[in-house]
Design a protein with these regions (language model features):
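Gly/Ser/Thr-rich phosphate-binding loop
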Residues: 107-112, 121-185, 198, 208
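Short, well-ordered beta-strand segments
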Residues: 20, 60-62, 68, 218
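Conserved AMP-binding/adenylation subdomain of ANL enzymes
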Residues: 43-60, 68-109, 194
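Conserved AMP-binding A3 loop
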Residues: 19-47
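Short Gly/Pro-enriched turn/cap motifs at secondary-structure boundaries
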Residues: 188-193
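Short beta-strand->loop structural element characteristic of the AMP-binding/adenylate-forming
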Residues: 1-3, 33-36, 63, 85-92, ...
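Conserved pre-ATP/AMP-binding loop-to-beta segment of ANL
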Residues: 7-24, 31, 54-60
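Conserved beta-loop-beta connector loops within the AMP-binding
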Residues: 200-218
Length: 218
């Protein structure tokens, strides 16, 4: 085979002192990219998320999302911040042993993307006896309205909380959430900004939008 010798530098580029990790995302464009996050981002997001979810040390969240995914990662550092116990299993949601694990370990919360809840819906989730499950949270894309309402009403009628969220990998996951008390009434809305955060809409000239049903940029 033909080959060419090339002299290259053996020095590595200097990393920024505050860089904690690179988070993969496809973003709205569909092309893969990496988002840079500093340690302060993790600390702030952990505080904000644990605050609006009202997380506590006795919580036992079930981990089903991958750690390289922004929402899965945010679930970890927000719960670790309050000293909660994170339940980890390699079992699929379609495996009967997954549900045995959930019940035996008394899981108190479940976080998923729209596809996760589509699977739960097909598995007759609403007929299951899950007395320890207190909180269901959703993110990772817009959920079909009928399915959103179905889970919101189930949680309302069974003493549980349903909280849909909106976010971006660039913002360490969650940027907005719809409080459980508005889950049915305001279904489809991204809700309000997370604690210590602000959201606003602007028009093409950069002016704030204050009227309803007006298109703009967030």
């Amino acid at each position: 085979y033909d080959y060419t010798l090339a002299k290259i530098s053996d020095t590595s580029p200097t990393l920024h002192g505050e860089l904690s990790h690179l988070l993969p995302t496809s973003g709205s464009t569909g092309s893969p990219k990496l988002v840079r996050h500093k340690y302060g981002n993790i600390e702030a997001a952990g505080l904000n998320i644990s605050t609006f979810f009202e997380l506590k040390e006795s919580d036992r969240p079930l981990m089903v999302l991958p750690l390289y995914y922004t929402m899965g990662l945010s679930m970890v550092f927000s719960h670790l911040r309050v000293g909660a116990t994170i339940l980890i299993t390699g079992l699929s949601m379609t495996d009967i042993n997954f549900w045995k694990f959930l019940k035996e370990q008394r899981a108190t919360s479940f976080t998923g993307v729209p596809y996760s809840f589509q699977i739960l819906n097909l598995m007759r989730f609403f007929r299951m006896d899950l007395p320890h499950l207190e909180l269901l949270t959703q993110g990772g894309g817009k959920m079909p309205t009928d399915l959103n309402i179905k889970f919101a009403e189930y949680c309302r009628d069974n003493g549980k909380r349903w909280i849909a969220t909106y976010g971006q990998s660039e913002c360490t996951a969650r940027m907005a959430y719809l409080p459980a008390k508005w889950a049915v009434e305001k279904v489809g809305s991204i809700g309000i900004a997370v604690p210590n955060g602000e959201l606003s809409l602007i028009d093409t000239d950069g002016n704030p939008i204050t009227t309803p049903h007006t298109e703009g940029e967030m």
